[in-house]
């Protein structure tokens, strides 16, 4: 009992230290936690999540090549046009566009490019930017749990398919439930006071001359290579979805399966990157300097540290976890969503949270190919690994706060009372609630 107390203390200390350090520090602190748990507290090291890391590396490599060719800028340009064309619907369009960009790219960092546009359009419509900004940021986080090319979705589909839930079926649950949750949250937020000219902080900044008029962005002509790189990437994503469905046991168009799902995604994405470099005539040596590549490799280190730390602790206490979880979650299914929500707050990654906890939950609930009665609980609760918005230290949250010159998107005096908490909790709660309705019908 005393040993377990110290082990939990080390686990929590490592997670809080990582959150405090931020960036690569999240992964570094995870490695420190593994070192202490194994060398000083007698635990056996868990499994290093090589599969998730390799998928992130491959997808990020392809997106980075597309960014270098101008394809990512072209994609954002399309999104900007949609937002500017329908400014009055900014509260619905901002999360919709952010969601779609994340679904396609497999990373929520694409929302960075939308933040200045959202602020400008909101200002022009006398709407507090904090509403569409918070909705967009949160939507980009929950969309990770529905993106065909995100590491979290690929991991989940890989571990759930042997249990009878194929890739396409899972997407049929996760995409509509998460998107509808984003739209319902936007509708609910519409009942709050959204008038910008009623915000005293904004009026104070306006009077002090701290708010500059929106800058007109110079329209740049999109090159043919930029458009081509985007279409190559989209083609790769579609090919992955079709191939992953074709090799599933329920469809079985491809038999025998020579290239498994994880290997297929890595090889497809690297092939996409190769085609972009060849046909879009970009310098492959410069790809590593792109912002997407740097943030993606940072994500790899974070997943390495925190997922390894989580698996080290969980794998050494699997019997106790099975004993308590088997009856608690079976009797109170929503507790899994709560546990995943709390874990992702600290692990700071949808993929790392899934990798650290889901295998143990499957074992604890006794789910197998012959016993799938509790499978819907895991599928329905998956969206709750998106609680990266709770601590206001995530890059997209900080970016939204920094770029909102109206001052309506605030950090909060007591850490948790920031602009993203209520929309985030609503989106995740509604996603899970809808999941519990849809998952039993589809599976």
From Swiss-Prot:
Which Pfam family is an annotated match for this chain, by its short name? DcuA_DcuB
User: A Gene Ontology CC term for this entry?
Assistant: plasma membrane
Q: What is its main location?
A: membrane
Keywords on record: Cell inner membrane, Cell membrane, Membrane, Transmembrane, Transmembrane helix, Transport
The record's section on InterPro entries has: Anaer_Dcu_memb_transpt
Q: Which domain of life is it from?
A: Bacteria
Q: Show the stretches that span the lipid bilayer.
A: 21-41, 46-66, 99-119, 142-162, 171-191, 228-248, 264-284, 295-315, 327-347, 375-395, 419-439
Q: Where in the cell is it found?
A: Cell inner membrane
What is its membrane topology? Multi-pass membrane protein
Q: Molecular function (GO) terms listed?
A: C4-dicarboxylate transmembrane transporter activity
Q: Which NCBIfam families match?
A: Dcu, PRK09412.1, PRK12489.1
Q: Which PANTHER family match?
A: ANAEROBIC C4-DICARBOXYLATE TRANSPORTER DCUB (PTHR36106), C4-DICARBOXYLATE TRANSPORTER DCUA (PTHR36106:SF2)
Its biological purpose: Responsible for the transport of C4-dicarboxylates.
Family statement = Belongs to the DcuA/DcuB transporter (TC 2.A.13.1) family.
Q: By what name is this protein known?
A: C4-dicarboxylate transporter DcuA
Species in which this protein is naturally found: Helicobacter pylori (strain ATCC 700392 / 26695)
Encoding gene, per UniProt annotation = dcuA
């Amino acid at each position: 009992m005393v040993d377990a107390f110290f082990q939990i203390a080390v686990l929590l200390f490592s997670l809080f230290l990582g959150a405090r350090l931020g960036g690569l520090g999240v992964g570094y602190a995870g490695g420190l936690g593994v070192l202490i748990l194994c060398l000083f507290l007698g635990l056996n090291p868990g499994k290093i999540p090589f599969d998730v890391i390799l998928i992130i590396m491959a997808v990020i490599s392809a997106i980075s090549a597309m960014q270098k060719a101008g394809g990512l800028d072209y994609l954002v340009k399309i999104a900007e046009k949609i937002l500017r064309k329908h400014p009055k619907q900014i509260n619905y369009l901002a999360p919709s566009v952010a969601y779609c960009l994340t679904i396609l790219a497999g990373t929520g960092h694409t929302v960075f490019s939308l933040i200045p546009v959202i602020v400008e359009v909101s200002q022009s419509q006398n709407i507090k930017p904090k509403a569409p900004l918070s909705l967009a940021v949160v939507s980009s986080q929950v969309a990770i749990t529905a993106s065909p090319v995100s590491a979290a979705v690929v991991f989940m589909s890989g571990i759930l398919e042997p249990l009878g839930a194929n890739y396409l079926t899972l997407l049929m649950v996760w995409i509509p439930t998460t998107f509808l949750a984003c739209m319902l949250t936007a509708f609910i937020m519409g009942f709050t006071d959204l008038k910008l000219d009623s915000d005293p902080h904004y009026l104070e900044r306006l009077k002090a001359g701290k708010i500059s008029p929106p800058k007109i962005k110079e329209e740049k002509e999109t090159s043919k290579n930029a458009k081509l790189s985007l279409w190559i990437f989209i083609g790769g994503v579609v090919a992955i979805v079709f191939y992953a469905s074709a090799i599933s046991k329920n469809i079985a168009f491809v038999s025998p399966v020579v290239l498994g799902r994880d290997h297929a995604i890595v090889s497809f994405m690297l092939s996409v990157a190769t085609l972009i470099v060849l046909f879009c005539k970009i310098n492959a040596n410069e790809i590593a300097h792109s912002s997407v590549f740097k943030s993606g490799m940072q994500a790899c280190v974070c997943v390495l540290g925190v997922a390894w730390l989580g698996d080290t602790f969980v794998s050494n206490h699997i019997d106790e976890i099975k004993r308590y979880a088997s009856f608690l979650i079976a009797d109170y299914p929503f507790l899994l969503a709560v546990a995943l929500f709390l874990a992702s707050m600290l692990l700071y990654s949808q993929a790392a949270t899934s990798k650290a906890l889901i295998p143990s939950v499957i074992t604890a609930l006794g789910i197998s190919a012959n016993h799938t009665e509790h499978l819907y609980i895991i599928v329905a609760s998956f969206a709750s690994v998106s609680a990266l918005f709770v601590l206001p230290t995530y890059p997209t949250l900080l970016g939204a706060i920094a770029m909102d010159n109206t001052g309506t998107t605030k950090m909060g005096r007591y850490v948790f009372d920031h602009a993203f908490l209520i929309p985030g909790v609503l989106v995740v709660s509604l996603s899970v609630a809808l999941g519990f309705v849809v998952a039993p019908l589809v599976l």
